[in-house]
């Protein structure tokens, strides 16, 4: 694009002045000296990484994971922390619910000796700790569990029954404004786990909403809705949950995609089962009757045995994983998406209700 010489001279002068006042990189052309690819960390589930479009959750952004109780929210974040630690990243867990189980975290592959953990007394304290860790530039992933447990100081110091209308929402709104810029500058991922509440008197549409006001919905680059859809049984014993995750909002790829996987009690996400299912679906793993085979070699009779074979042979599992990621994760184009979740939008008409 040809720019008038006088305009170009004036533009260069003002750009130089801005950089002198606010520092180099404070303003630049969108395609200049920027990493166009978003750095991501795997969620621990291949199907969810594919649904997110970029191969995982994005660094330098705010992420919200919400769902009913015992749906797998904390498990998903612990799987992500384990994946981040394997890449040499520093992680922190702000345990506002005071319910983190270190034994379970260790079973999922989390290095608990190097996981920073805080159990704050108030919501303000939790968010100040988040801000301090972010500004240090030394922490890569911060998880806050949960937004509903971030109780404002005024509410803690007051009496039960006192009205504190909008306090938590105001606190979250202020924190989002402060944190968003710092997270981008230091390339830190901040994950908020959230709970579901019911709106009173809703006759039409979805009565469900999340706690902490609307600020988090707007500032989050990715919002995940996680639900338990069924039980996994071995004979009469329940050994895990069938889980569905819906990408409600996505600023790094197309939103509204879904992923289904299994969470096994005491083990976390059933990765090998996913590899078998996706391998068969994309013709990497052959299935003949009950037998599964890979590159002509039989790997097991039945899905469970095929999964066990991959668990015992991590090199083959890694080979299938790499091949599937290469097939399913194309280059990501940033999506133009709504600032509200799909619970407020009619997908057919696009009307907000």
Curated annotation (Swiss-Prot):
Supply the alphabetized keyword list.
Answer: ATP-binding, Cytoplasm, DNA damage, DNA recombination, DNA repair, DNA-binding, Nucleotide-binding, SOS response
Q: Name the residues that bind ATP.
A: 67-74
Q: Does the keyword RNA-binding apply?
A: no
GO terms in the biological process aspect are: DNA recombination; DNA repair; SOS response
> One GO molecular-function annotation for this sequence?
ATP hydrolysis activity
At the top level of its lineage, which domain of life is listed? Bacteria
A GO cellular-component term linked to this record: cytosol
**What subcellular locations does the record give?**
Cytoplasm
Is DNA-binding set as a keyword in this record?
yes
Q: What's the family?
A: Belongs to the RecA family.
Q: What does this protein do?
A: Can catalyze the hydrolysis of ATP in the presence of single-stranded DNA, the ATP-dependent uptake of single-stranded DNA by duplex DNA, and the ATP-dependent hybridization of homologous single-stranded DNAs. It interacts with LexA causing its activation and leading to its autocatalytic cleavage.
What protein name is recorded for this chain?
A: Protein RecA
Q: Specify the taxonomic lineage.
A: Bacteria, Pseudomonadati, Pseudomonadota, Gammaproteobacteria, Alteromonadales
């Amino acid at each position: 694009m040809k720019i008038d010489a006088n305009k170009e001279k004036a533009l260069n002068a003002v750009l130089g002045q801005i950089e002198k006042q606010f520092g180099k990189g404070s303003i630049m052309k969108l395609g200049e000296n920027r990493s166009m690819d978003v750095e991501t960390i795997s969620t621990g589930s291949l199907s969810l990484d594919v649904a997110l479009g970029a191969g995982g959750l994005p660094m330098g952004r705010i992420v919200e994971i919400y769902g009913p109780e015992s749906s797998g929210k904390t498990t998903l974040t612990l799987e992500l922390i384990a994946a981040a630690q394997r890449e040499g990243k520093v992680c922190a867990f702000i345990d506002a619910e005071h319910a983190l189980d270190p034994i379970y975290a260790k079973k999922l592959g989390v290095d608990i000796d190097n996981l920073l953990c805080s159990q704050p007394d108030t919501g303000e304290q939790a968010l100040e700790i988040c801000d301090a860790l972010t500004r240090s530039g030394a922490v890569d992933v911060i998880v806050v569990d949960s937004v509903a447990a971030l109780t404002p100081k005024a509410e803690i110091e007051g009496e039960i029954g006192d009205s504190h209308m909008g306090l938590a929402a105001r606190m979250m709104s202020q924190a989002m404004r402060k944190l968003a810029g710092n997270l981008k500058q230091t390339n830190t991922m901040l994950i908020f786990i959230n709970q579901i509440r019911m709106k009173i008197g809703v006759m039409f549409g979805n009565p469900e909403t999340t706690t902490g006001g609307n600020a988090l919905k707007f500032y989050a680059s990715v919002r995940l809705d996680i639900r338990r859809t069924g039980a996994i049984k071995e004979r009469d014993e329940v050994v895990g949950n069938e889980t569905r995750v819906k990408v409600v909002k996505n600023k790094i790829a197309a939103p509204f995609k879904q992923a289904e996987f299994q969470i096994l009690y005491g083990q976390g996400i059933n990765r090998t089962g996913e590899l078998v299912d996706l391998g068969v679906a994309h013709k990497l793993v052959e299935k003949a009757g009950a037998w599964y085979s890979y590159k002509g070699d039989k790997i097991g009779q039945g899905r469970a045995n095929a999964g066990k074979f991959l668990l015992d042979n991590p090199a083959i599992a890694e080979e299938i994983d790499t091949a599937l990621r290469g097939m399913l994760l194309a280059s990501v184009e940033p999506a133009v998406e709504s600032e509200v979740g799909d619970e407020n939008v009619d997908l057919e008409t696009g009307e907000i209700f």
